[in-house]
């Protein structure tokens, strides 16, 4: 996993809030296996049943933060044993919550981040996410964007 630049990097809380979900201890995937991971992704996308299936098989180790009424942040696929927060804990934006991992239904080490309208990740709907600042590659140069929402076609970066 150490060949992946993000694996083991610290993950920071994107907002002030209260931790309403934190699950650790789900086994880290030992290697990447594209065919097996694609098969799992297909199975989870089409046949996942929240009544009988474990959400950790999809999300791996995760933290859910309540930001405001009906807005929750989920940070998933965290490294096993790295979560540093617990349910009920008030946290501040920028506080370390864990490390990037390769747990759950993950093609390779990465951080899955989403805003959603419920603390239950298995039934929540997505909420648009605005970033305070990022850069977009446009007209052959990087341009700073403040308080924007990138589109699915934008090439962006953070620093």
Question: What is each of the regions a protein language model found here?
Answer:
Residues 1-28, 138-159:
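Polar/charged, compositionally biased leader and regulatory segments
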Residues 17, 88-100:
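A structural signal for short beta-strand/turn segments enriched in small hydrophobics and glycine
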Residues 84-87, 102-109:
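Short glycine/proline-centered loop/turn elements that form peptide/ligand docking sites
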Residues 18-78:
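Zn2+-dependent peptidoglycan hydrolase active-site motif and core
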Residues 46-49, 53-55, 89, 114-159:
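Acidic, glycine-rich catalytic/binding loops that coordinate metals and/or anionic ligands
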Residues 5-7, 58-59, 83-84:
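Short, small/polar residue-rich loop motifs at catalytic or cofactor-binding pockets
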Residues 24-27, 97-106:
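Short, charged beta-turn/beta-strand-edge "cap" motif at the junction between a beta-strand
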């Amino acid at each position: 996993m150490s060949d992946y630049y993000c694996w083991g990097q610290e993950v920071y809380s994107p907002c002030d809030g209260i931790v309403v979900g934190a699950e650790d201890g789900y086994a880290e995937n030992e290697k990447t296996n594209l065919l097996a991971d694609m098969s799992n992704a297909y199975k989870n996308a089409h046949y996942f049943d929240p009544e009988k299936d474990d959400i950790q098989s999809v999300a791996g180790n995760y933290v859910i933060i309540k930001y405001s009424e009906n807005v929750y942040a989920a940070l998933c696929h965290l490294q096993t044993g790295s979560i540093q927060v617990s349910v009920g804990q008030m946290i501040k934006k920028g506080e370390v919550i864990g490390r990037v991992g390769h747990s759950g239904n993950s093609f390779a080490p990465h951080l899955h981040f989403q805003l959603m309208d419920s603390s239950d990740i298995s039934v929540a709907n997505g909420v648009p996410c605005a970033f305070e600042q990022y850069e977009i590659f446009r007209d052959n140069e990087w341009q700073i964007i403040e308080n924007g929402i990138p589109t699915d076609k934008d090439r962006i970066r953070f620093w």
